[in-house]
Amino acid sequence: MATSISTQRGQVFIGELPQDFLRIAPTQQQQQIQLDAQAAQQLQYSGVMGTMGRLSITVVQAKLAKNYGMTRMDPYCRIRLGYAVYETPTAHNGAKNPRWNKVIQCTIPPGVDSFYLEIFDERAFSMDDRIAWTHITIPETLKEGKHVDEWFSLSGRQGDDKEGMINLVMSYTSVPAMMPAQPVVLMPTVYQQGVGYVPIAGPVYNPGMPMIASPPAVNPQHQTQEVDIQSIKDMFPTIDPEVIRSVLEAQGGNRDAAINSLLQMVEDS
């Protein structure tokens, strides 16, 4: 317990300081703000249950209005769904009637109800040329367990819905979505007179995951040195290994320089 004594400069504390030294207890409003912030963090990082869909899109074929290639046209499809991008293989020399028969498995995040499809002509010596595109809304009938096999109009240089058509087969599967809970650091707020105090959090480990100790690192230089010592020992069997080690370290690990030094030692002896 600290004791108070008077000096020429005023009253000072001697000994262990109290826990509330130079600290002001938070008001009810400050406590409420802190609790609200903690609740917001818990809502943000806690596991959120919901549903998300898995959409299967079979890109069958297309019937295009025009061949934009100089000698041939090698079309491929690109699908953008949410933040993900999927592509089909190139239908080499597919021209106006490319066939892909490519099945693409897409995960539909919550809130996404459409995807964007583009057709490109693959070029060998220049950038690929975009020749057709369309925006497709995912049919609601898919969520009822039905399959959709339809032709969708394509837009392009010929105009809206005038660049041809593409055949897609779609099916939908609902899967549960679980976001893993994240560890949350809740540090007490300390209010200090005249000084801003920012709590520093140490490492936080999720109690649900066991800590795995990392294996000790092996120094490759040490292994190399042991190999060199053994090989030099075979050349100089009468010299103590510790002497060889000392000479090798003195030469900075240079094996040839160490051998020359040992030869000089043997000749001098």
Curated annotation (Swiss-Prot):
Motif (AIM2): 151-154
UniProt keyword annotation of Cytoplasm present: yes
Pfam families recorded: C2, CUE
Protein name per its UniProtKB record: Toll-interacting protein A
Family named by the database record: Belongs to the tollip family.
Entry's Gene Ontology molecular function annotations: ubiquitin binding; ubiquitin conjugating enzyme binding
Residue ranges constituting the C2 domain according to the UniProt record: 35-152
Domain comment quoted from the record: Both ATG8-interaction motifs (AIM1 and AIM2) are required for the association with ATG8 family proteins.
Function statement: Component of the signaling pathway of IL-1 and Toll-like receptors. Inhibits cell activation by microbial products. Connects the ubiquitin pathway to autophagy by functioning as a ubiquitin-ATG8 family adapter and thus mediating autophagic clearance of ubiquitin conjugates. The TOLLIP-dependent selective autophagy pathway plays an important role in clearance of cytotoxic polyQ proteins aggregates.
Record key words, sorted: Autophagy, Cytoplasm, Immunity, Inflammatory response, Innate immunity, Repeat
PANTHER family in alphabetical order: TOLL-INTERACTING PROTEIN
Organism from which the protein derives: Xenopus laevis (African clawed frog)
Subunit structure, as described in the record: Interacts with ATG8 family proteins (via AIM motifs), and ubiquitin (via CUE domain).
GO cellular component: cytoplasm
Placement of sequence motif AIM1: 133-136
Subcellular location: Cytoplasm
UniProt domain CUE: residue ranges: 224-267
GO BP terms, alphabetized: autophagy; inflammatory response; innate immune response; phosphorylation; ubiquitin-dependent protein catabolic process
Main location: cytoplasm
SUPFAM superfamilies: C2 domain (Calcium/lipid-binding domain, CaLB), UBA-like
